[in-house]
């Protein structure tokens, strides 16, 4: 239980800092992580060289940038309690929100398929805080404390959350029946029963 309270305390402190400072700290953490996480760094570099045909230089530059941005993303996630309807518009921009409203207006519910790019947690937060009736499916973490903490952040900005491996199918069906927006992030291995699809 101490881990939960540690995460809550960190989030409380971070969410009371100026946003620009939060990002700067995150970028610094990302640079530090890139240096110390040698095993993960090498594995990531080898993967994109093999799968995407990157050169050594391209792979190193890409993974370094990724690690740095992940640091900022971590800090932004911890900052989520500070997000509200007033400040989210200055932090997240939607190109065509009218398209989503139009789709919801058809009264059939909307399935929104996204991927783990940029800050996917803020995407859900921005949708919910902008008034979209968002239900989302989350993949439980090996340590349930992380899942509980993350779901608390998600619910705090107005999302309805279903966990994979429970009764999420029923939850998704109910969300669609209520004409809600169902958010799915489906760019991960589906496991033993997963289906591989072409990518890039």
How would you label these PLM feature ranges?
Residues 1-114, 149, 156-158:
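Membrane-anchoring hydrophobic helices of lipid-metabolizing enzymes
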């Amino acid at each position: 239980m101490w881990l939960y309270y540690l995460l809550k305390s960190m989030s409380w402190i971070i969410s009371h800092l100026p946003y620009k400072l939060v990002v700067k700290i995150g970028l610094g953490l990302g640079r530090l992580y890139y240096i110390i996480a040698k095993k993960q760094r090498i594995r990531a570099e080898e993967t994109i060289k093999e799968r995407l045909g990157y050169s050594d230089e391209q792979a190193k530059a890409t993974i370094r940038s990724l690690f740095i941005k992940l640091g900022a993303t971590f800090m932004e996630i911890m900052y989520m309690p500070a997000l509200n309807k007033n400040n989210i518009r200055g932090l997240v921009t939607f190109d065509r929100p009218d398209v989503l409203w139009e789709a919801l207006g058809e009264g059939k519910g909307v399935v929104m398929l996204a991927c783990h790019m940029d800050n996917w947690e803020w995407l859900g937060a921005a949708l919910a805080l902008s008034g979209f009736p968002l239900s989302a499916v989350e993949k439980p973490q090996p340590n349930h404390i992380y899942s509980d903490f993350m779901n608390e952040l998600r619910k705090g900005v107005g999302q309805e959350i279903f966990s994979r491996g429970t009764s999420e199918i029923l939850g998704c069906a109910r969300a669609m029946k209520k004409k809600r927006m169902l958010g799915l992030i489906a760019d991960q291995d589906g496991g033993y029963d997963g289906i591989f699809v072409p990518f890039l």
